[in-house]
Amino acid sequence: GLFDIVKKIAGHIASSI
């Protein structure tokens, strides 16, 4: 769902830090 996309983006950002 939409939340899954948000989590995926959030995970990518966290991985970038």
Swiss-Prot record:
It is found in: Secreted. Expressed by the skin dorsal glands. Pfam families: Antimicrobial20. One of its GO terms (biological process) is defense response to bacterium. InterPro entries: Aurein_antimicrobial_peptide. GO terms for cellular component: extracellular region. Keywords: Amidation, Amphibian defense peptide, Antibiotic, Antimicrobial, Secreted. Belongs to the frog skin active peptide (FSAP) family. Aurein subfamily. This is Aurein-3.2.
